[in-house]
Amino acid sequence: TLKRRIASISVIHKMKGHYLDTKHPIIMENLHGIKRVKGTNQSSKKPILINDLKLIINVIDEENQSEKRKIRDRAIILVGFSGGFRRSELVNIEYEDVEFVTEGVKIFVKRSKTDQSGEGMTKAIPHFINSNYCPVKSLNEWFNKSGIKSGKIFNISDKSVALIIKKYVSLAGLDANKYAGHSLRSGFATSTADAGAEERNIMAMTGHKTTQMVRRYIQEANLFKNNA
């Protein structure tokens, strides 16, 4: 595919000591233009929306497993959703990156897929009104239960995140084949778009550098709004 060829070109550039930003707006805009002309088959996984999230958290609470595992998995899913995290970002959060404040919790992301220079960004997650689904409360409970004082807070792989999500999606009665690790991130973007969040505010939280993907989430959220 075109994306694979671009990735190959990027690898060759790196081998020769050059850096190619494959996410540069000019490259992304050209790819988007090609898609408009040629068309593309959108086979992306479904987002986990608010109601889905509540079903999943309820299932975790009812699951026959250790309390420590329940608390960890709740924290992974609630923090992953509410921060619009990529799986790679989520599993690389360290204790030192987390700061609880009056308004909620601040989490510093040292490096992400679109932050090749490693400048980092801070995600601010507020308290939720319903404490059963509050990511701040959930993360604090995980720290207290695990006793973690340094290093990675979850200590699992990004593949494990996907498996955890699929496990609880299935237990919640949803089709696990239609969801993936990315469903938390896309669910956050779609849900906030549905709630009326502006494009720039969604991008500030998710870390998207171009509007293409975010606009797709907004379009998804607006499908049944103002429908003639």
Can you annotate each of these PLM segments?
Residues T1-A228:
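Extended, non-catalytic subsegments within catalytic or DNA/protein-binding/adaptor domains
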